[in-house]
């Protein structure tokens, strides 16, 4: 999938839509000569997997989704309903501005991986995930 591992990384942000990512999954099946498959995804990859099966049921007959249920399209962009508090960290917001996250994460790669894998220094308070003034999403 574009932008991951050693895959291509288009510069234009508009090249990373769900339609493009689903197209990447279809392209992978084509390249491997596979007509139909079960697709699995975790987190952001689960969103791609759900949409791959929704948009191309001829190619994806089932979904294995980890940590993200199927979510119908919302009239409001997800990034607009996430709390924008200084102490709240939502990775989707964190990666919106090109180069910002990369500069911070690459500053100390070892420490980045220790925090990501071990949770060191992360505040796990549920308050980070509560929308202030809202009854829910």
Where are these regions (language model features)?
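Flexible "cap/lid" subdomain of the alpha/beta-hydrolase fold that forms the substrate-access gate
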Residues: 4-8, 13-40, 44-137
């Amino acid at each position: 999938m574009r932008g991951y591992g050693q895959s291509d990384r288009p510069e234009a942000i508009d090249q990373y839509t769900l339609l493009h990512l689903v197209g990447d999954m279809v392209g992978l099946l084509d390249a491997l000569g596979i007509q139909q498959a079960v697709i699995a995804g975790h987190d952001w990859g689960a969103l791609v997997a759900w949409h791959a099966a929704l948009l191309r049921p001829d190619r994806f007959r089932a979904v294995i989704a980890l940590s993200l249920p199927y979510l119908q399209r919302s009239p409001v962009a997800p990034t607009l309903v996430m709390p924008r508090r200084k102490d709240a960290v939502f990775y989707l917001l964190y990666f919106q501005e090109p180069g910002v996250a990369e500069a911070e994460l690459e500053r100390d790669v070892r420490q980045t991986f220790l925090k990501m894998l071990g949770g060191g220094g992360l505040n796990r308070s549920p308050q980070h995930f509560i929308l202030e003034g809202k009854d829910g999403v």
